[in-house]
Amino acid sequence: MTQQLQTLIDNAWDNRASLSPSAAPKEVVDAVEHVIAELNNGRLRVATREGVGQWTVHQWIKKAVLLSFRLKDNELMKAGDLGFFDKVPTKFAHLSADEMAATGVRVVPPAVARRGSFIAKGAILMPSYVNIGAYVDEGTMVDTWATVGSCAQVGKNVHLSGGVGLGGVLEPLQANPTIIEDNCFIGARSEVVEGVIVEENSVISMGVYIGQSTPIYDRTTGETTYGRVPAGSVVVSGNLPKDGGRYSMYAAIIVKKVDAKTRSTTSLNDLLRD
């Protein structure tokens, strides 16, 4: 079934220029809708973890997300007295109180999660935004004004502090999703984008910006890497000298490995998750 679905989506993607809401084969429309529904309930996800820092990205699922925009017209949506005009409904719009309770998720107004995202049991959405295709795992808090971009993957017991931004894959088009692994703490107003992977148990200080071109410098080893924060790292914003010291350029600096002191200041509050 999955292989047939993947083949159908891949073929539709190759012929996407010919697709529109009024001109698309029913089997393509049904296939895309099936993928979005499976993403919404967590049975499919854009990327699956194979080990620490090792992920397999399912490009065909990302293609289905993109095709869903091609196959739908905008429509009027209401939230109380507010009106919206979009192609993607919100995730919880039509759930009853019992159905919401069964999800095990706490949603603080005016948090928004789009249909096609998955929010696992025990997660908390403060007034924040979770885009289509994203996966937020158990016990994670998405704090106020944080944004989880399209298809981003967030692990268990993660804290995304106020104003954090995780980049999406839809625009500009990115090959791989941004990934935050289990037990990470991302400090206020930090941005992780362009498919960067923050490996498990890491702490990103406030105001750190990491993309694929950002040097990640380990002050202990002197090594500079790109696109990946090693497991258990404590990262702050800094600068590295360039051109013999004539000027400096922004870098993310690994200052140490996570220790007991770090954990005591970034631990999750179980009282908020009852």
Curated annotation (Swiss-Prot):
The keyword Acyltransferase applies. Disulfide bonds: none annotated. It is found in: Cytoplasm. It is an enzyme of class 2 (transferase). Keywords: Acyltransferase, Amino-acid biosynthesis, Cytoplasm, Diaminopimelate biosynthesis, Lysine biosynthesis, Repeat, Transferase. Pathway: Amino-acid biosynthesis; L-lysine biosynthesis via DAP pathway; LL-2,6-diaminopimelate from (S)-tetrahydrodipicolinate (succinylase route): step 1/3. Its EC number is 2.3.1.117. It comes from the Bacteria. It catalyses: (S)-2,3,4,5-tetrahydrodipicolinate + succinyl-CoA + H2O = (S)-2-succinylamino-6-oxoheptanedioate + CoA. One of its GO terms (biological process) is lysine biosynthetic process via diaminopimelate. Substrate binds at residues 106, 143. CDD domains: LbH_THP_succinylT (cd03350). GO terms for cellular component: cytoplasm. InterPro entries: DapD_Trfase_Hexpep_rpt_fam, Hexapep, Hexapep_transf_CS, THP_succinylTrfase_dom1, THP_succinylTrfase_N_sf, Trimer_LpxA-like_sf. HAMAP family: DapD (MF_00811). Belongs to the transferase hexapeptide repeat family. This is 2,3,4,5-tetrahydropyridine-2,6-dicarboxylate N-succinyltransferase. It comes from Acidovorax ebreus (strain TPSY). The lineage of its organism: Bacteria, Pseudomonadati, Pseudomonadota, Betaproteobacteria, Burkholderiales. The gene is dapD.
